[in-house]
Amino acid sequence: HKHQKVLHDDKHRYIAVVAGRRFGKSVFARHHCLLNALYEQGLYWIVNPTYRQGKQIHWHELKKEIPRELIGYKNEQELSIHLVNGSRIEIKGADNEDSLRGVGLKGVVVDEAADQKPRVWEEIIRPTLLDSQGWAVFIGTPKGFNWFYDLYLKGMKGSKTFDPEWKS
């Protein structure tokens, strides 16, 4: 829908999407990773608070949404899809922090960001984007004044913590 298109077209490095249920955040997350993976070869993640949650929300839908001719192969154990252009999209869980280390990412969607530990972003995921100058999108529903709210403020012009690399 039109709000998702605005998000897809945005060129900010970091985007915080705070939206209510049924906005289409999960669909946006999958499509955003796919569009970027088709445009620029690399590794893209969708990270949920838990591996199980990522599998339930994204894995089966992602397999259906990517046209067969774009898929090189799928790895059901690792929840990864290798595209014919060499890109890879993986579903991850922040509950297994060790599985998030030691790689370089082109882009990541942090899903249900308010339910994740800020340390996972700051100490584990963010460093994976440094070499490629990769992007990150944080999505979730509003859940009070927490680290996700703080990220949201970074993208709001006029806030004390505004950062021009961010959009909310």
Residue spans of the language-model regions?
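Phosphate/NTP-binding elements of NTP-utilizing enzymes
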Residues: H1-S168
